[in-house]
Design a protein with these regions (language model features):
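Active-site-adjacent substrate-binding region
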Residues: 2-104
């Protein structure tokens, strides 16, 4: 979640299993102007979150999609990271966690 050209669509397994949490995260992102969080539905991405969803736990996968060409290659280096992208994700998730004690 730190690519310079970060794009985080609404991953579909998360949408199916934790729509309410995903909606909360995207509302926070919108209110903060976090442009990396895109309002469109993404793809079904098989990733580490699936066992949790299958166990009945609500989880949301925040993942850059489509994967950049450098993803998991020798070109996937620190210079491709962006402090702004990390800050957007960090602020959104911090606010999401903070709000968990509040009524919806």
């Amino acid at each position: 979640v730190c690519d310079r050209d970060l794009v985080i669509p609404q991953e579909r397994f998360s949408r199916d299993g934790a729509r309410d949490l995903q909606d909360q995260i995207w509302r926070i992102a919108q209110s903060q102007g976090a442009e990396a969080f895109k309002p469109h539905k993404g793809s079904y991405i098989e990733d580490d979150h699936l066992p949790f969803l299958r166990a009945g736990l609500k989880v949301v996968n925040l993942i850059h999609w489509p994967f950049p060409k450098s993803w998991h290659t020798s070109g996937d280096t620190i210079d491709r990271c962006s402090a702004d992208s990390l800050q957007q994700v960090g602020r959104v998730i911090s606010e999401f966690i903070y709000r968990q004690g509040e009524p919806l």
